[in-house]
Amino acid sequence: TGWEAGTEMAALRRLVNYWGSGYDRRAQEATINALPHRRADLDGTPVHYLRFDGEHPDALPLVLTHGWPSTFLELVELARRLATPTRHGGSADDAFTVIVPSLPGFTFSPQRPSLPPAAPTHELWHRLMTAELGCTRYAAHGGDLGAGVTTMLGQSHPEAVVGIHLLAVADPVDVDPGSITAEERAYRAAVAAWFDDDGGYEHQQMTRPVTLGYGLSDSPVGLLAWLVEKYRAWTDSDGDLSRRFSDDFVLTQASLYWFTNCISTSFRPYYEYARGMREPLSRVTVPTALAVFPHDLSQPPRSWAERSYHLTRYTRMPRGGHFAAHEEPQLLGDDITEFFRDLR
């Protein structure tokens, strides 16, 4: 009983029963179909994305990148706020034209060919923003896996990326142990403790993703159990997921994974990272903001981020968790807006 060993049976049974009789799949499909979907072919790699045009003629282009276990759907409310700020009490001068791509292997973006030689995701995003959409300057935001993509955009293309806004940061390389502060040591210890207690999923997805994928691709109940445990644990919900995610939202997320058969391919970034199939991190020189939500997986101190990034803004949020764009779109949207206001 309870959630200590994983997804609680009673909670899962209730969701499964609603999924089978009560959940209006057609209504959710209609909502998804009404979104501004686009598709690009980037040198043979198809990429799905949403485009929300900014309400100002000089709106700054902004690419938002989701993480795991997320989809484009999680970013819709945030994107709307950023594209049309006057509808939410803001100024049209702060508008962005917002691009929300689906990561390769997630929902409507098929998995890339095995790496190498396929282009890494951040290079696909740069092609999307420049060659496909014609942007010469653009901004970027991401959390979780999306923070990694956004970091690499800032590192690789400072000539085009005006700044990056992150919900997580990469660990610095070649840290002198003698330079680590007490606050940084406490942070690293907290991360290690979290991994020991809650990181089993990550180890499995890093090491044997295909084996796990067979089971989750064969059972919608198993897939839902794998996802909902993370949604409950990683939100600022005090154990009551319905405070943050409605049943319809949870089941629509699960349905997107199920009907596009993408759960196995969504593990691919973990496998690639574990095998060094990513470009190494060097110092990111573009202006960087970090927003730290108290119920996210980790809360890096400012000094830790400053080791690898040109950090010009650091915000400790009063509430919110790992899925900040859906949990707290106003808090996150305001922080993004304020950060990029002087970088336009």
Task: Please state what every model-predicted region is.
Residues T1-D58, F249, W258, T265-E279:
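Non-catalytic accessory segments flanking enzyme active sites
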Residues A59-G67:
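Short beta-strand element of the alpha/beta-hydrolase
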Residues W68-R80:
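The serine-hydrolase catalytic nucleophile loop
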Residues P69, P104-T107, D171, G321:
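Alpha/beta-hydrolase active-site loop signature
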Residues L73, H88-G90, D94, I99, ...:
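Glycine-rich "HGGG/HGxG" loop immediately N-terminal to the catalytic nucleophile
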Residues R81, P85-R87, E132-E184:
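Conserved hydrolase catalytic core segment
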Residues S114-E132:
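Alpha/beta-hydrolase active-site loop
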Residues Q205-R344:
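C-terminal subdomain of alpha/beta-hydrolase-fold enzymes, centered on the catalytic histidine
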